[in-house]
Amino acid sequence: MIYGIGTDIVYIPRILRISQKYGEKFLNKVYTKKEIEISKKYNSQEVRAKYFAKRFAAKEAFVKALGTGFSQGIIMKDIEIYSNIRGKPHLAITKDFISKDYKIHLSLSDDQDYATAFVVICVE
C-alpha cells in the first residue's frame, strides 16, 4: 500500500551558483560525506552540479512523500542518495524517523537545466 508520494524539480544552474558561492559550507550542510566524496569523480563543475541537484531534489521529494517536510528534526544530511552497482538510485536514512516496514522507491532524472526526483513510500 502506498503511504506517500513526493516529487521535486531543481534548476541545476541554481545549485551550481550556490556551490560556487558557498563552496564546502553549502555542500557540508546539505550532503553527506559519502555523497560529497562520490561527487569528486566528476571533473566538470557542471556535471557535479547535476549530481548534487538530483540528490537535492530526491531529499525534497522524500520529505514530501513522508508528509512532514523538513520538520520534526529531519535535516538534509539525514538523507543519503546512492546508486547500486547497476546505477539504480536508492535512499538511505541515518535516523529512525520512518518505520523499517516501509519500502522507499526513488527515480532520478535530468535534462538540460533541470533535475527531477520522484519518491514513493510503500507500507510492506
Swiss-Prot record:
Keywords annotated in UniProt: Cytoplasm, Fatty acid biosynthesis, Fatty acid metabolism, Lipid biosynthesis, Lipid metabolism, Magnesium, Metal-binding, Transferase
GO annotation terms (biological process): fatty acid biosynthetic process
InterPro entries assigned: 4-PPantetheinyl_Trfase_dom, 4-PPantetheinyl_Trfase_dom_sf, ACPS, Ppantetheine-prot_Trfase_dom
Protein family according to the UniProt entry: Belongs to the P-Pant transferase superfamily. AcpS family.
Disulfide pattern: none
Cell compartment(s), UniProt: Cytoplasm
Gene Ontology MF term list: holo-[acyl-carrier-protein] synthase activity; magnesium ion binding
EC number: 2.7.8.7
Species assigned in the record: Wolbachia pipientis subsp. Culex pipiens (strain wPip)
Residues that coordinate or bind Mg(2+): D8, E60
TM regions (residue ranges): none
UniProt name for this protein: Holo-[acyl-carrier-protein] synthase
Cofactor: Mg(2+)
HAMAP family attached to this UniProt entry: AcpS
